[in-house]
């Protein structure tokens, strides 16, 4: 008869850290070129007017303006609306 307690728990108890994905600038917020708008895996959201997409699908501002989210043909787009010069 074995005199050992169950020893499986030492192999458990680890997990990877969260990736900090999601929207970084919300609708109506002012942004400048280079600001990160959305960090994502794959194209959950698509770049619209005034927005670029990095190789890891990060969306970032190309122009100064205000963030706006729109839906078109079952795709969510992120736009930067440039304020009219005054």
From Swiss-Prot:
It holds the Pfam family Ribosomal_L27. Coiled coil: none annotated. The keyword Repressor does not apply. Keywords: Ribonucleoprotein, Ribosomal protein. GO terms for biological process: translation. GO terms for molecular function: structural constituent of ribosome. Belongs to the bacterial ribosomal protein bL27 family. PANTHER family: LARGE RIBOSOMAL SUBUNIT PROTEIN BL27M (PTHR15893:SF0), RIBOSOMAL PROTEIN L27 (PTHR15893). This is Large ribosomal subunit protein bL27.
């Amino acid at each position: 008869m074995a005199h050992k307690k169950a020893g499986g728990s030492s192999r458990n108890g680890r997990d990877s850290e969260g990736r900090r994905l999601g929207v970084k600038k919300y609708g109506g917020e002012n942004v400048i070129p280079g600001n990160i708008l959305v960090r994502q895996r794959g194209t959950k959201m698509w770049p619209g007017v005034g927005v670029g997409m990095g190789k890891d699908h990060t969306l970032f501002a190309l122009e100064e303006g205000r963030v706006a989210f729109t839906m078109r043909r079952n795709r969510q787009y992120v736009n930067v609306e440039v304020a009219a010069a005054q």
